[in-house]
Swiss-Prot record:
Keywords: Cytoplasm, Iron, Iron-sulfur, Metal-binding, Oxidoreductase. GO terms for biological process: cysteine biosynthetic process; hydrogen sulfide biosynthetic process; sulfate assimilation, phosphoadenylyl sulfate reduction by phosphoadenylyl-sulfate reductase (thioredoxin). GO terms for molecular function: 4 iron, 4 sulfur cluster binding; adenylyl-sulfate reductase (thioredoxin) activity; metal ion binding; phosphoadenylyl-sulfate reductase (thioredoxin) activity. The active site is at C230 (nucleophile). It is an enzyme of class 1 (oxidoreductase). It is found in: Cytoplasm. Pathway: Sulfur metabolism; hydrogen sulfide biosynthesis; sulfite from sulfate. Belongs to the PAPS reductase family. CysH subfamily. It comes from Geobacillus kaustophilus (strain HTA426). Binds 1 [4Fe-4S] cluster per subunit. GO terms for cellular component: cytoplasm. This is Adenosine 5'-phosphosulfate reductase.
Amino acid sequence: MLTYDQWEKAEKPSFPSDNETKGALDVLAWAYREYGDEIVYACSFGIEGIVLIDLISQVKPDAEIVFLDTGLHFPETYDTIAKVKEKYPSLRIVMKQPRLTLEEQKAQFGDELWKRDPNKCCELRKVIPLREVLTGVTAWISGLRREQSPTRRHVEYINKDDKFRSIKVCPLIHWTWKDVWNYVYKRHLPYNVLHDRGYPSIGCAPCTAPATDPNDLRSGRWAGQGKTECGLHLA
């Protein structure tokens, strides 16, 4: 088994990127053979997440899908999760919540921490919960695409994740925005209606706005904060 500690010595698998799913199904088939129940998919239920869930369901219908439920998501996001649960009843969708409720966070750090220190808020409500999830597994799946942002352009199918001391599997690295939507329409998949309202990237409601730059899908995230990532994908 390819693990974090054995990364340097282990032989890394290679996958074709010129087939119908640009390698995604091949990567997922390998990942679930390699790790079985020791791999989880941390899903935001954005549009890439919907594609990955559908692909995963074809490989492992009872896979574990973890949603980092910060308590600050849009109602439309929770509606999307409900639709996904209905479409894929065999999937094990886990709503992972932070240790602190919003009221406890307010008492300890002050009101609306996301405005004053968004990095701290993301750490408390996303990074630490994901670290807790990954403590019990060897690898995790992410919907990162190289096209999404400059910080993601060098992502590989299989990555050594130093932040979480884990293996990070990214099946969609070669998919374009058009590829994602073509797949969703072709498969008639449910998706977050906010995507139709100018939100290509969707996170917590207080820190997400419609995209301001048509060439930057994440330009609506943490607008004016000098921040482009929640911290899950930064070493």
